[in-house]
Design a protein with these regions (language model features):
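Secretory targeting and sorting signals
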Residues: 1-22
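Active-site mouth of glycoside hydrolases
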Residues: 27-42, 46-245, 250-258
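Substrate-binding cleft of secreted/luminal carbohydrate-active enzymes
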Residues: 43, 273, 294-368
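Acidic (Asp/Glu)-rich catalytic clusters
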Residues: 66-73, 187-193, 261-271, 302-307, ...
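Aromatic- and acid-rich polysaccharide-binding/catalytic face
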Residues: 196, 202, 250, 261-290
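Surface-exposed beta-strand/loop patches in extracellular or lumenal glycoproteins
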Residues: 399-419, 448-449
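C-terminal beta-strand-rich structural cap/linker in extracellular carbohydrate-active enzymes
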Residues: 409, 433-455
């Protein structure tokens, strides 16, 4: 660690108060903030173990995951946890599973990675050969289910799966059980320094009614079932944790550029957490720049946070076949789009191998995924005016108005591997640098420009 020592007189001059101002438009999407009021940017990956259960649960996640993510400049992990592992029998919560979650959170804390605890489900849960809601909480009314091994997402449209979602949303005892599950998690991890918040359910779906097309059904499910569910679960979390952020997802249909039907969630710390997937690319197609998918997605997905004034964090994104001819352009355009409206994202998925994995067995980025590693400001002590990064020149620029005298004025930068020169102008100094990170101290109310240049 290389530390730059700053003379006391210089620091004192930076702490002298000056006038501050902010420029916020009516359509501005709020930024996610930390406990000190700093504007956060989250860049990271999903971390998961879907293969192991019981005594082996979470065993595929190791300390190496967090060490390697932080070494490449990422500060965020969306940790998948499963209700079927937490409560394998109704009313009996696995203390061993909670300890395993705690061990993973300990590694995140060690490497200064913020964690979102995600109550994950795929195709509802184990009753249908996947993970998520326990079998004891799965009610199908005897409706049929046919597996689709070559297209697992199609299983969401099987009658038994759709009916199971309806019961989860509507049955009073299942509502209470889901709320209790969240109280257990929030009570256990509310004081853990690595925990940023709670993603209440992954990619929720529901039951289509006769004559409905998919967008119409999705908006109805979001409006009539997901909105009240999220309000119930937010209340459950708040009964144990008053400070963590509550992340709420629309149905995955937003990936088709369909605005959500979600209503207001009555909680002061809500984050809108859509996923960013295109059905054609998920089926193996290349990115088609002429189709305008990114533009239509961005237009649709920003309506909710603008209306309800909540921050956005994209919980999953990234194509399966990332080495196709147009994927380099996709990653560049996707990164630019995400930077325009979100407070961050978690790519899918940090693992060592093929498929969706971010890196190969040697820990090297797989084709085009290196484009996700950019300089960014993890925490800005003030109001962000603009950020930009030009990969061609290797220049990152942040302009912000620093906070007032009674608030934090320490801004933190994350830098990808390599040699970087960091400079600050406007009554600000680069207080300290280490490999991959830098800290900037600014006078209160100053207009500050920070530049990081790849050498």
């Amino acid at each position: 660690m290389r530390t730059t020592l700053v003379p006391t007189a210089v620091v004192a001059s930076l702490l002298a108060p000056t006038a501050a101002h902010a420029d916020t438009g009516e359509d501005a999407i709020p930024r996610l903030t930390d406990s000190r009021g700093r504007a956060l940017t989250l860049r990271g990956w999903n971390v998961e173990d879907k293969a192991h259960r019981g005594e082996q649960a979470l065993s595929a996640i190791t300390e190496k995951h967090f060490r390697d993510m932080r070494a490449k400049g990422f500060d965020f992990a969306r940790l998948l946890v499963f209700w079927d592992d937490l409560e394998p029998r109704q009313g009996q919560y696995s203390q061993a599973y909670l300890r395993k979650i705690g061990r993973v959170l300990g590694w995140a804390e060690k490497y200064d990675v913020k964690v979102l605890i995600d109550a994950h489900q795929d195709v509802f849960g184990p009753a249908f050969g996947h993970r998520g809601i326990p079998e004891w909480a799965t009610r199908t009314d005897g409706l049929p289910f046919t597996p689709h091994p070559d297209d697992w997402f199609a299983e969401y449209f099987e009658p038994a799966v759709q009916r199971a979602f309806t019961h989860l949303y509507e049955d009073a005892d299942l509502r209470r059980a889901q709320a209790r599950m969240w109280r257990v998690l929030a009570d256990r991890f509310r004081d853990h320094p690595a925990v940023l918040g709670y993603d209440l359910i992954n990619e929720p779906m529901g039951e289509l009614r006769e004559g409905e097309d998919l967008p119409t059904a999705a908006r109805r499910i979001e409006r009539e079932q997901l909105t009240p569910m999220y309000n119930r679960l937010a209340d459950a979390v708040r009964s144990a944790d008053r400070d963590g952020w509550v992340f709420v997802e629309p149905t995955p249909i937003v990936g088709e550029g369909v605005p959500t039907g979600l209503g207001r969630i009555d909680d002061p710390k809500v984050v809108y957490a859509p996923h960013f997937y295109n059905s054609g690319m998920e089926a193996g197609a290349d990115y088609d720049p002429a189709a305008g998918w990114i533009e239509s997605y961005e237009q649709a997905v920003t309506r909710y946070p603008k209306e309800y004034k909540v921050p956005v964090v994209v919980g999953e994104w990234g194509p399966l076949n990332n080495s196709l001819p147009n994927m380099n352009r996709f990653y560049r355009e996707a990164m630019a789009s995400l930077g325009r409206y979100s407070s961050g994202w978690a790519g899918y998925v940090w693992c060592y191998g093929g498929g969706y994995c971010a890196v190969d067995g040697a820990g090297t980025f797989r084709t085009n995924k290196e484009l996700t590693a950019e300089p960014y400001a993890e925490a800005v002590a003030g109001t962000v005016r603009s950020t930009s990064y030009d990969p061609a020149t290797g220049v990152y620029r942040l302009v912000y108005d620093s906070a007032g005298r009674h608030r934090s004025r320490l801004t933190e930068l994350s830098l990808p591997p390599g040699a970087w020169q960091v400079a600050a102008r406007g009554r600000a100094i680069v207080l300290r640098r280490t490999e991959g990170r830098a800290w900037v101290l600014a006078a209160p109310g100053a207009r500050v420009t920070v530049t990081a240049t790849r050498r």
